[in-house]
Design a protein with these regions (language model features):
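Fe(II)/2-oxoglutarate
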Residues: 2-16
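Peripheral, non-catalytic segments flanking oxidoreductase cores
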Residues: 6-7, 18, 173, 177
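Non-catalytic accessory segments flanking enzyme active sites
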Residues: 26, 30-71
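Generic structural signal for secondary-structure transition and capping sites
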Residues: 47-51, 98, 212
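Short Pro/Gly-enriched beta-strand edge/turn motifs at strand-loop
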Residues: 49-59, 128-133, 273-277
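Rieske [2Fe-2S] iron-sulfur-binding domain
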Residues: 59-162, 166-176
């Protein structure tokens, strides 16, 4: 069995990979997916630097609504405070450094589960039992460190990078592309978390191309997915995209009769948006669903999976039954995607793994590789 050049690091291999024009492009090399060293670079240069999607803003609608996450090893909470402001802050107690909140929910205050130090929703320490005998203790000196948080198109985005450009500035091209869909007005109706046994980029790339649909999804949507109906233009620096036209009989994927924003063929267009590094959105005129991905080691990915409906369908008497059918379909599609992407990761770990040439329908994958190289190997 012929082995590849082991003197190159995965970072070097990625740089060589994207040096080829798209017309000669190959898939990314295996080490980019399987290497601990490459993952460390990603956490430092991608997930600590770029904006990460947490959830939809309407999922945190009331004061005290919160959700938690670990971003590049940093425990973070996103919470709506008493003034109605969404804020992200450290999820680590300032006493003995226990994490504070778990999962998602609603709380009147933030209480440490270890010694009951209690914080207001804005992160200021409200009280700490049995601290009066410590002469240097001052309650007013304690406040949870804040993390940058912005709302964009209804999404809650956070970053550990104080110098990252605003989300709206980076993604102005997305607004130009789908502004008439009114994505900021769509309502989230479900949210789940999952962990799959594959690399996060394998799942991201699986979303970015629809080339796999007829085969991987033969049991669900494959028969409705015509390769000739898929359009994959070159991507932008902060995102890539492609689109598919849906048949008119797929009611929820088409514009509602009361939708006056969308005209012509746009009333049946489905956009697949990949917002770097790891927000993946399927946006139709009637509903949306998304994945927000974070690595859990090289061989596992943590998935924040949600979706919902456009405002016209939210108010339609038949909408809930339509969406329940779509959610059942999405669950079945995810079973197929999980099987395919976990097989890919097992193959990537093989000594025989070699990157093959890309189809013209995998243009988004090439653009994603270029984005990663720009972050990992900056000029």
């Amino acid at each position: 069995m012929t082995r590849h050049d082991t003197t190159l690091t995965p970072m070097d291999e990625l740089a060589q990979n994207v040096a080829q024009p798209f017309e000669r492009a190959r898939a990314m090399p295996p080490g980019v997916y399987t290497s601990d060293a490459f993952l460390a670079e990603e956490l430092d240069k991608v997930f600590r630097q770029d904006w990460f999607c947490v959830t939809r803003a309407d999922a945190l609608a009331e004061p005290g609504d919160y959700t938690t996450l670990d971003l590049a090893g940093q425990p973070i909470m996103v919470i709506r405070d008493r003034d109605g402001q969404l804020r992200a802050q450290s999820n680590v107690c300032l006493h003995r450094m226990s994490t504070l909140l778990e999962g998602s929910g609603n709380t009147r205050s933030i209480v440490c589960p270890y010694h009951a130090w209690t914080y207001n929703l804005d992160g200021r320490l409200r009280g700490a039992p049995a601290m009066t005998l410590n002469e240097s203790f001052c309650k007013d000196a304690y406040a949870l460190p804040q993390v940058r948080c912005e709302e964009w198109q209804g999404w809650v985005m956070v970053t550990l990078n104080p110098d990252a450009p605003p989300v709206a500035e980076q993604l102005s091209g997305v607004q130009d592309l789908i502004g008439d869909f009114g994505m900021q007005h769509y309502s989230q109706t479900f949210f789940e978390t999952h962990r799959w046994d594959t690399n996060w980029k394998v799942l991201a790339e699986n979303f970015m191309e629809s080339y796999h649909l007829p085969v991987c999804h033969a049991g669900t949507i494959g028969g409705l997915s015509r390769l000739e109906d898929m359009v994959c233009p070159p991507g932008e620096p902060a995102f890539n995209y492609h689109w598919i036209y849906k048949e008119e009989h797929f009611t929820l994927a088409n514009a509602h009769p009361t939708n006056t924003r969308l005209k012509g063929d746009r009333r049946r267009m489905t956009f697949l948006l990949a917002i770097y590094p790891s927000l993946l959105i399927t946006l139709t005129p009637g509903y949306f669903w998304y994945l927000s991905l974070h690595p859990h080691g090289p061989g596992q990915v943590d998935i924040r999976f949600g979706g919902g409906m456009s405002p016209e369908f939210v108010n339609d008497a038949q909408a809930q039954s339509h969406f329940e059918a779509v959610k059942t379909l999405l669950d079945d599609v995810n079973v197929e995607d999980r099987g395919c992407t976990e097989k890919v990761y097992r193959g990537l770990c093989s000594d025989a793994a070699r990157p093959g040439h890309l189809s013209h329908l995998e243009r988004p994958n090439y653009d994603f590789a270029c984005y990663l190289n720009n972050r990992i190997n900056p000029a």
